[in-house]
C-alpha cells in the first residue's frame, strides 16, 4: 500500500467517521440512509431508523467530568456496534445522540435489536471505579411507509424520540401521526410560555 493510498484512506476516515467514537458521522449517515431508501423503493421491503438519545447524560458529564463522559460515549458506541444486526449501521449524530439504520435485510431482527439495546442500557457502566446507570430514549420510524426522504425520516424519528422523553424517558416509542400532532402542540405551548 502506497503512502498516497494510506493518506487517501485517512482523509476518507476523517470525512466519514466521528473522531471520538469511530462510528460513522452524520454526513455518512445521510448518504447511507438515502441509499437504503432507494434500495427499499427499488427492490421492495421495509427499513427502520432508530434514533437514540442518552437520558440525563449531562449529569454524568458535569458530575464526573467530560473525560468520563467521553469514555462512556466510547463504551456505548462499542457496545452498540457489537449487537448483531447493528454492527456498521450505527452513527453518532453528535453529543449523546446515535442513529441506527436497519435496512431491509435487518428489519426482521427489529424486535431482537430493540431488546438487545434495552438490555444494554439496563446494566451499569463502570466509570471512575464505580457503577453508573445511563438509560436511553429512542424513537423509531419505518421507511418508506412513514417517510421516504432523509429529512422526513429524521424529523419523524425525532418526534417519536421526543414522545419517549416526554413519557418518562428510558422508553422506546414508534412514530405515529397522532404523536406528531401532539408533539407539535406541546412544542407550540412551550414556545409561547
Regions of interest found by a model, annotated:
Residues 53, 57, 76, 98, ...:
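Hydrophobic framework residues that shape the active-site pocket
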Amino acid at each position: 500500500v502506497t503512502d498516497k493510498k494510506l493518506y487517501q484512506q485517512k482523509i476518507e476516515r476523517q470525512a466519514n467517521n466521528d473522531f471520538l467514537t469511530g462510528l460513522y458521522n452524520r454526513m455518512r449517515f445521510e448518504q447511507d440512509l438515502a441509499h437504503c431508501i432507494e434500495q427499499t423503493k427499488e427492490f421492495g421491503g421495509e427499513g427502520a431508523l432508530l434514533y437514540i438519545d442518552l437520558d440525563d447524560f449531562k449529569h454524568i458529564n458535569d458530575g464526573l467530568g467530560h473525560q468520563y463522559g467521553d469514555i462512556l460515549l466510547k463504551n456505548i458506541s462499542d457496545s452498540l456496534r457489537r449487537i448483531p444486526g447493528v454492527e456498521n449501521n450505527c452513527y453518532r449524530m453528535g453529543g449523546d445522540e446515535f442513529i441506527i439504520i436497519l435496512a431491509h435485510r435487518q428489519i426482521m431482527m427489529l424486535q431482537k435489536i430493540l431488546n438487545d439495546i434495552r438490555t444494554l442500557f439496563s446494566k451499569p457502566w463502570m466509570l471512575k471505579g464505580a457503577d453508573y446507570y445511563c438509560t436511553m430514549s429512542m424513537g423509531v420510524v419505518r421507511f418508506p411507509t412513514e417517510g421516504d426522504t432523509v429529512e422526513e425520516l429524521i424529523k419523524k424519528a425525532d418526534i417519536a424520540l421526543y414522545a419517549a422523553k416526554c413519557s418518562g424517558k428510558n422508553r422506546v416509542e414508534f412514530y405515529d401521526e397522532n404523536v406528531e400532532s401532539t408533539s407539535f402542540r406541546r412544542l407550540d405551548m412551550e414556545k409561547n410560555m
